[in-house]
Amino acid sequence: MRHSVRAMALLCGGLVISSAASGQSREQVNQEARAIFKELIEINTTDSAGNVTLAAEAMAKRLREAGYPEKDVIVAGPQERKKNLVARLRGTGQKKPVLFIGHLDVVEALRSDWTVDPFQFLERDGYFYGRGAEDMKESDAILVMNFVRLKREGFHPDRDLILALTADEEGGSYNGIDWLLKAHREPSCALPNSSFRPENQHKLFRSPAALPEPASRPAFRTRRRPG
């Protein structure tokens, strides 16, 4: 599937920390987010042949490189190929934690159903193409990029912020959200992936000025297996 380049750029630039304060230009932030997105697309995380753990470990590496200590970045789960990423940005503890949740697994992608390689990241005519570009590796990349920036700039919230990127959303939740609820049930609420679309962006990741609306919405046609 495909995702609008402009929509992703708007979201990646929407942190409460300005680009000037971060030492990165908006373009640098967008390019780093694009690199994260590309890395995720090119890791096959389908149920049949993929490995969600590889994607979780790749994102964990980026978070650790941004300054998160080992104890605050965990890759864990009950199955070797389907582990979850949980990262914590520690705050003052004045309020209960907030969980930002997404999933790393994707639906199956047969090469015969695609005009391009579904596991080769492609940018063309203002759109990104690849399995997971619409559901939901674009949101995963935005989340990881924002957590990276928050850590780099020493953002210290009044509560812990927790990032969870899970396995098995597409085919069942045993290895993903069900396991997390049993093993790490503490956040006060969850913010689903819809919170990171331009029309429904959470206030924590919104810039002080209102974000402009995209000129057009992503649109696509599919015979089967959307996402």
Residue ranges and their predicted role:
Residues 24-131, 150-158:
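Acidic/His- and Gly-rich active-site-bordering loop/insert found
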Residues 7-18:
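Bacterial N-terminal signal peptides
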Residues 47, 134, 169, 226-227:
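A generic structural motif
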Residues 127-128, 134-213:
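Acidic/histidine-rich catalytic neighborhood of metal-dependent amide-processing enzymes
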